[in-house]
């Protein structure tokens, strides 16, 4: 990598293509096979370039590389096709930036799979449940409802699940995904239809998962965890697309919904950690070179690549069972407070999307249909109307895409577009994206002030670790509306619904 290249020298490799699109040209980092691209508006653009400027001044010392460098390093991986893409919520992460997606040609024997392109929280994702309740029904019992959710769902760093499960159950759940939840009575038949991959990755093989991962996962099923994970009671604030909203069962402002954001907990983290160790050895054996050690990878068809994909699929299934379990517990909490059944409250699952995953998909590449391994890290699948992999209910409106905001700010529901299939392998943003590091948030914000501000906004909050609440304060993140509007302007997704929180449950 060029030593201490000045900020102005770096700019020579960056081209602004239109109001929202930048290209990172080959040469920005060594060995780039394809160009990098990123999508921003003026405000998000400033954040990206400030990060690059600081990195140039520090002569490359410090924590993670800037997101632009990470997007470019991914463009240097073997077997990548077309481009490495940074979405508007992109920010520095481990290996891949969070909000970075890339696709690799499955027919190319050199092509790789990289755990850093999926992340440690495999299938961290979001699901949205609708209800037939109105804000006026919920406001008088908002605190009681928040407390009931907090009591029903185990939250926080070391939280243990309440879903009874032995080692055999776990192994079955890892391979069956939502089908396990359905069999055990924790999910409704309709839930499965409204999950990405129908809630089950078929290539999952529990024998590919080490005992340490299973040991970590067993007590954590049906738990929310900490960090940016949450359950929120939200209200429909704005409807941008009447038809798409009606397909989802959302027909008026003020309708109450529930959003659950969680992943594969310690289980997914261990699967990723184990794979990185195995892949470092495989890279030496197969002489695979990368620009960044954090981009440890293995050829897709190598034993290590296949083992990781099987283990990753298990972690994805774990996360779907986890969110299904929390859906069951949320339905119970609502039923208790309103003294009725979840059925009578019409607590149907609108959709469940993954934000951290690698999947084999058919895409048109150079006018040919090609099987690609699409790595989506901090990004969301967003397939258009008529795509064969989305449910019948959404065939005419496009796949729902769930975008969680930050604590106390709005969230969005988008739909996938044809342009997204062409530009970003059917992918859009996943949320707000961090603007400050967790350490900076803790230094600059007071947790009591953050909690008081939420109370002033009329948001009922229950937090297991209040002293960590600054890390998730709105100031710590980019503005989710900027992110969503940029994706809408570029045309890779379309706005359908805006949601605002009235109660937040956090780890």
UniProtKB/Swiss-Prot annotation:
Gene Ontology MF term list: GTP binding; metal ion binding; RNA ligase (GTP) activity
Recorded superkingdom: Eukaryota
Pfam (any one): RtcB
A GO biological process held by the record: tRNA splicing, via endonucleolytic cleavage and ligation
Cofactor note: Binds 2 manganese ions per subunit.
PROSITE patterns attached to this UniProt entry: UPF0027
Residues reported in the UniProt entry to bind Mn(2+) 2: 124, 261, 355
Positions of Mn(2+) 1 binding: 121, 124, 229
Documented EC number(s): 6.5.1.8
CC annotations in GO: nucleus; tRNA-splicing ligase complex
Annotated catalytic residues: 430
Enzyme class: ligase
Cofactor: Mn(2+)
Binding site for GMP: 228-232, 355-356, 404-407, 411, 430-433, 506
Protein's UniProt keywords contain Ribosomal protein: no
Swiss-Prot/TrEMBL keywords: GTP-binding, Ligase, Manganese, Metal-binding, Nucleotide-binding, tRNA processing
Recorded catalytic activity of this chain's protein: a 3'-end 3'-phospho-ribonucleotide-RNA + a 5'-end dephospho-ribonucleoside-RNA + GTP = a ribonucleotidyl-ribonucleotide-RNA + GMP + diphosphate; a 3'-end 2',3'-cyclophospho-ribonucleotide-RNA + a 5'-end dephospho-ribonucleoside-RNA + GTP + H2O = a ribonucleotidyl-ribonucleotide-RNA + GMP + diphosphate + H(+)
Function: Catalytic subunit of the tRNA-splicing ligase complex that acts by directly joining spliced tRNA halves to mature-sized tRNAs by incorporating the precursor-derived splice junction phosphate into the mature tRNA as a canonical 3',5'-phosphodiester. May act as an RNA ligase with broad substrate specificity, and may function toward other RNAs.
Subunit (UniProt): Catalytic component of the tRNA-splicing ligase complex.
Family recorded in the similarity comment: Belongs to the RtcB family.
Extra facts: Ligation probably proceeds through 3 nucleotidyl transfer steps, with 2',3'-cyclic phosphate termini being hydrolyzed to 3'-P termini in a step that precedes 3'-P activation with GMP. In the first nucleotidyl transfer step, RTCB reacts with GTP to form a covalent RTCB-histidine-GMP intermediate with release of PPi; in the second step, the GMP moiety is transferred to the RNA 3'-P; in the third step, the 5'-OH from the opposite RNA strand attacks the activated 3'-P to form a 3',5'-phosphodiester bond and release GMP.
Protein known as: RNA-splicing ligase RtcB homolog
Organism: Branchiostoma floridae
Lineage: Eukaryota, Metazoa, Chordata, Cephalochordata, Leptocardii
